[in-house]
Regions:
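Glycine-rich beta-strand-to-loop/alpha-helix junction loops that act as flexible
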Residues: 40-41, 186-191
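Short hydrophobic/aromatic beta-strand micro-patches
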Residues: 194-196
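Generic non-transmembrane alpha-helical segments
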Residues: 9-17, 64, 68-71, 170-179, ...
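ATP-binding N-lobe of GHMP and related small-molecule kinases
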Residues: 1-36, 54-66, 100-102, 110-113
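DPxDG-like acidic metal-binding loop motif
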Residues: 36-62, 78-82
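Conserved, helical-rich catalytic subdomain that frames metal- and/or nucleotide-binding sites
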Residues: 81, 86-183, 198-201, 208
Length: 209
């Protein structure tokens, strides 16, 4: 692995933090598109920390592991928690974890070069955004209410992503009109979107159009 990747940084920092011998071989099969808003490098680092924590006999939510995740970068700590969760700060302060639930999801990636995270945040700053509460969504997640959660999906970066890439807006319009889609939203800073579907069959149909 190149030494400047988030995976390398996560592994070496955790080994040092735990006093473990970093005698491990790590390979990464990249399946997450770049510039899609899916947290590719953060997800890689989070998965690395979870795997190494297990290997070295430490809980992935141990304060030392979380501390390393924060040092690696934004949102890495989020990927230490394998259940729906509310994180604050730079995606590194766990506010609440919710029960797991099953919900068929399809990802739709438009045929574009994607959107850089920095460009999305710059556009967000330019456009401005009113704060939106998340209590209704959290209440639905606590209750395992998929329909309620679908009704309160929100991403304040979505308008910026749509402004930078018209295909993002077109995908959202298309998903809105599809049968079997409970709700859809842009992932992170874009350019991918996800659809929360009624059934696995609906999700597969959306994913293979």
């Amino acid at each position: 692995l190149p030494e400047k990747t988030t995976v390398w940084k996560a592994a070496t920092l955790l080994a040092k933090e735990l006093g473990a011998e970093p005698a491990v071989r790590i390979s990464v099969t990249a399946r997450i598109p770049e510039r899609a808003g899916l947290g590719g490098s953060s997800a890689d680092a989070g998965a690395t920390l979870r795997a190494l924590a297990r290997l070295w006999g430490v809980n992935a939510l141990d304060a030392r592991v979380v501390g390393v995740a924060r040092r690696v970068g934004a949102d890495v700590a989020f990927f230490l928690q394998p259940v729906p969760s509310l994180y604050l700060g730079a995606g590194d302060v766990l506010e609440e974890a919710f029960p797991s639930f099953e919900a068929p999801i399809a990802l739709v990636m438009p045929a574009t070069n994607g959107i850089s995270t920095q460009a999305a945040y710059d556009e967000f700053d330019r456009m401005g955004s009113e704060p939106v509460g998340y209590e209704d969504l959290c209440a639905a997640l606590r209750a395992g209410d998929v329909r309620g959660a679908a009704a309160h999906l929100y991403n304040n970066l979505a308008p910026a992503a749509s402004s930078l890439c018209g295909e993002v807006a077109r995908v959202q319009e298309w998903l809105h009109d599809q049968p079997g889609v409970r709700a859809s939203q842009v992932t992170g800073s874009g350019s991918c979107s996800f659809a929360l579907c009624e059934s696995t069959e609906d999700a597969e149909r959306i994913a293979h159009v």
